[in-house]
């Protein structure tokens, strides 16, 4: 696969007889990175500004639905110190409950699950790990009930413990199948279903668990269980917990938990207040990014492209919602906004000649070379150049690391992959599935996003990590494959209407001589296998710090969410809009008597 990928990238350029002399890098007003030299030649084309308008495509993207004035009008209603004081008091009470030594250990385990799903887990990482370590030290993950055994397994794997799936063998019959007597235990079946998505490649018992629970949970009759449990089953069948983005799940679970008769009032109020306070932080970040995006002026200049600041910000919240990651969210919002704009240049507006030129100039990272670009590409290149250089300058100033070569390599590789897809489109060439995917997991932009994300985390960088980033370690590649396959499942119809032929669905159909439904099944199967590989990659032989591992996994989760019912990024429907509103715009109603 690595060889195929190299061949794809090497085939992305066309040789030209005339070249511009490489120049030294320049940063706006900074000379910190002077001395880096460019080895790649720049093809010198004649001006492309006279290209006929009729040669350019139009995607007819829907307009932006979140305008500047609306975003600036958000009130940040829970940023007051009064709420912060109340939140600290509630959190201390939750901490006391978690650390209660008199509580039965399995009761505490269920409490931890509620704490995590309510969105409070990040406040109690130390306490949660202490409880889970008790289960490891006592070797007591096996319980007589299926639901508690599965819950223990899931939580331990979520926190990186390589607990064996063999603990489920006691629930098998003499033929190696799950006992039919388990079917009536809906809570246990649901718990096993959720646990099965933490499986590694080759864990047959968890594959059996997934097939067994999926079949029987889908067969449940509404009258057989209570409404809350039915709601939980339907929610899980729609998308399992392990593949959901944390903050949207917290909103849903808080509202569901509030209807439970056994709900803990302290947990519930702590979760509601925390959600609203985090939401105010997100709104503040969003307003700052809205001002940045308006100041960039790209949207009115490049009217053919998608204006998707809110959707880009939503991606970053899905990757890292915690207040401490404000700088990371803002940096990634800039990156993803530029990716969206430049993607439309390649997909919709640029001629092949212009795209080859733009790709080569980005690879050179030469500010002087942009003079040969058409006007719409000049503003795009300069926006990219200034933004990436500014991020690199901040890292050099604050961390002492020169990260520019890693950032520009990721951008260059992505644009080469963009260019390959543009060639396939114009040639009406349908590549073989493997050839397509070797290019497409790079073109989907995951490596650019995650490379920036790593450096925005401000970690102490090691040589091993830098090599892993440069070589696109599995923790960059696996989320990118999931991102790509989800994207194709959600956008293939619109892409076909635009005349794009390179798509995993079409390649799969053509190569295997199968119909669209069978191709979708194949892609979903590949998605599941990639998740299994990533589950192991998360903690086995990973050189990356844990926060980055979680952010990389969250990239796959936000991709699943965005493309679950269509193209939630390029053509957001009412479902996508409501997700944004529930996560970023609309607070949860609090108990007025308390505050």
Swiss-Prot record:
Keyword Nucleotide-binding: no
Location(s), subcellular: Plastid, Chloroplast stroma
Enzyme class, broadest EC rank: lyase
Residue spans crossing the bilayer: none
InterPro entries according to UniProt: Isoprenoid_synthase_dom_sf, Terpene_cyclase-like_1_C, Terpene_cyclase_plant_C1, Terpene_synth_N, Terpene_synth_N_sf, Terpene_synthase-like, Terpene_synthase_metal-bd, Terpenoid_cyclase/PrenylTrfase
UniProt-listed Pfam families: Terpene_synth (PF01397), Terpene_synth_C (PF03936)
Descriptive protein name: Tricyclene synthase EBOS, chloroplastic
Induction field: Accumulates in response to Tetranychus urticae (two-spotted spider mites) infection, and transiently after mechanical wounding and upon treatment with alamethicin (ALA), a potent fungal elicitor.
Catalytic activity from the UniProt record: (2E)-geranyl diphosphate = tricyclene + diphosphate; (2E)-geranyl diphosphate = (E)-beta-ocimene + diphosphate
